[in-house]
Amino acid sequence: QLCPTQSLELGPIADISRGKTNQDKIKIEKDSCVLCGLCASVCAFDALNLEIDGKNIQDLPNYPKWTHFSEIDEENCIYCGKCSYSCPQDAVFFQRNLPKPTDLIHGNISINEEDCLYCKICEELCPVSAITIKAIPESSTRTDLAVPNNIEVDLNKCVQCGVCKRACPQNAIKQVCDTCMYADELPEPEITGKTFIDNNCVYCGYCKELCPEDTIKVVKPFDGEMLIPEAEECKDCQDCIEVCPCNALEIKDGFLSLNEERCILCGACVNACPLDALQLRRSSMKLENITNASWQKIIGKLLE
């Protein structure tokens, strides 16, 4: 819509999103493109880029600058992972480093093998699979006759829960937890990690909505509103739902429903609707440093 040489063409985005075709979402007519950089400047999601002498125009002083952003306060992040699991664009990554169980709890398990029946009850009940009962052949010639006769406890896995001790029918297991009686006095486990948002972010704010510690800040590129059609206008083709990059649209009780908090006013749904039933009204945008008067006029169409 803004290209002064009409060198951009939008592909069949609904079919592309459904996997029916492998066409590009945007086709650039290179013969008519004059490399003005207008399209790359107005794209709030870095889908189009133009480089001049090896430098992205977004880093050059004379081109418009977007000021919207998304960021995570890592100092207060608890590395729960909700932002990563919920991101519709898989743009949030996190790595969590947990302490070893043996650093948090200490104890010992002893087995009286004279009383042990090797019945495997403790092995099957152990919640962390710390107990292994094996059948070690007594004869190298008849390994098929081996019966369970060996028990091992992996103290690196054991959490000193005592389930094995309570379940043993022979009372053959003794369990002593050195730290359990002081559990309330022990320091909290130190959980470290790293969380970051990559360039696939579309600034929907869903991660911010779910974050239990309010450590995520999101400033969207546009302000305004999206008007969804009345029931009789919508034919339930769901093209708009397919192309929405932030899962802001869904069918509820047979009607198209919009999550306004998640909508980024990108206009993908408007372009996909075969009936032109959706209306986009932008009131402002986070685009600054528009120094060229002709560009100001063209870019202003985004708010019409």
Per-region residue spans from a language model:
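Flanking helices and flexible, charged tails adjoining ferredoxin-like Fe-S electron-transfer domains
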Residues: 1-304
